[in-house]
């Protein structure tokens, strides 16, 4: 089994953690943007079937 030889420095750990957080933030922004465009009806990539409740 592979074992790391030295301890990872705090700065390197912080950099990796921030990269990981930024990826999540970007995914959340995309999801929010897609949700907004679907709710307003301005989405060009999705077709939402409208149901008439009358």
Curated annotation (Swiss-Prot):
Transmembrane segments: none annotated. InterPro entries: Ribosomal_bL32, Ribosomal_bL32_plant/cyanobact, Ribosomal_zn-bd. One of its GO terms (biological process) is translation. Its main location: plastid. Belongs to the bacterial ribosomal protein bL32 family. It holds the Pfam family Ribosomal_L32p. It is found in: Plastid, Chloroplast. The gene is rpl32. It comes from Helianthus annuus. Keywords: Chloroplast, Plastid, Ribonucleoprotein, Ribosomal protein. Signal peptide: none annotated. PANTHER family: 50S RIBOSOMAL PROTEIN L32, CHLOROPLASTIC, LARGE RIBOSOMAL SUBUNIT PROTEIN BL32C. One of its GO terms (cellular component) is chloroplast. HAMAP family: Ribosomal_bL32. GO terms for molecular function: structural constituent of ribosome. This is Large ribosomal subunit protein bL32c.
